[in-house]
Swiss-Prot record:
Biased composition regions of type Basic and acidic residues, renumbered to the chain: 156-165, 175-215, 225-236
GO CC list: host cell nucleus
Name of the protein: Protein U79/U80
Source organism phylogeny: Viruses, Duplodnaviria, Heunggongvirae, Peploviricota, Herviviricetes
UniProt KW Acetylation keyword: no
Residue ranges with Basic residues bias: 422-437
Highest taxon above the source species: Viruses
UniProt keyword annotations, A-Z: Host nucleus
Amino acid sequence: MYAEERGYGSFDNVIQAYEQIISQSLHLKRFEFDNGCFIEFLADSGTCETFSKGWISMIYWTSETDSMGSLTVDIGMDEGKCRTYRARGLLLCSKSITSISQNTEGRERILTVSHENGKLQITFVTIAKVSSEPELRNLGDLKFMEKFEKECRALDRKKHDDEHRKRSGKQKEKRKVEDIDKKKEDEKLKQEEKKRNDEDKRPDKKDEFDEPPKEKRQKSHHETKRNLEEQSHEDGIAPTSTTFVNGAVEGALSPCVSIDNHEDQQHDELDKRVYAQGTNREGLSNEDNYGNFQLNKSLEQLRARLVASSGEVVERSLSKLKERLDYVKDNLIKNVLECADVTVPSKCLSKTKHIEQKKQIVFSDCVRSVPVCEIKPFIDMRVFETETTQNARRVRQRTRTTVGSTDGAIGQQRVISGQNRGRARGRGRGRVPRRRNSNLNNLRTQNSAIVIDDSSETENFENAGSFNEDLLATTILETL
């Protein structure tokens, strides 16, 4: 007998999560650990593996006599790894140790689990039986040793084959899936290639902008030329060499016409290359192609003249447009300056007496403070010769009549006073006699009131005969 397979596991900081007694003979326990280590030996080689955090599940069954049973230990790690150990046979159980010994054909398996003081130990050993007990006495015999080694090698080979069979089965399944995916990709590529080949085999579609054949092109050219000549005869215009197909005359250019010289140069280079090779794109001979080339060249010359003449016309129109824009711009600037909002009062430039304004003159949305002395020169006195001036004239006429009547009365009074030479009646002693000028002044002041507006205050002029322009301007400002 010899130990064929060995496994030793040690786990730290083990805590029992729960224990479940399903029946009197079936028990379930679960443990959790922080870190652990497991060492395996197979023949003359071994491996060591460490874990960080995981769980251990232990299921064991006992018979009625507690002499037989089974034990299964499952180890799971957070990293996704797992291990399983199981055994069935004779049972040895205590408070902290559970051990089972399984005896099969030529092999004996022992599984032991011990849990004590926060540590859990797992031991798994497989012992192989090679020969019977009498044969063990002849271990010194060379033949027996050779036989023993052959049996050991056979067992190792068998185990290796089993493992290889398992790995190969997994690899075959994986390879099968890869082959299926590869076949799908190949079929897809073949379909795309077939579709591409079918499109290449189709006849090329002619572009809409390809030139028509030579016969049709010449026919259309002659027809258009004939129509233009007939139209020019009807209109009284002599046909010249500068008349184009579209009816335009040399020097005239529509503003929406754009000429791409670069594209024409590319076409010319292509025609020259094709002519040098012997045939053009439409399969024409060198002579026909040369005629087309000459025709295109003459058209290019005419186009160049057209561009040169149109440039002058455009420059003239642009200069006129620029002048008009400058004129409109100057007018706009003047209007804006006139309507600008000026908060600082303007200074008086007049040498006459300056009268400060009491209100601002408002013209639409523009506000500007204007002194009275600047308004006065622009006042047309004839405009204000309305009711106020008419009233003033009436007052003058009345005063003249009253003055005449008063002169007569005064003359009569002088005669009476000369005759009587006494104190005038109706006058107290010690009073100053009334004078003619005082009566006239009172009469003038009573009749010289000029009303500018119903809402404004009435103002009296000192002298109705003379027109005070400064006072009139101030009154107009207050009214406005």
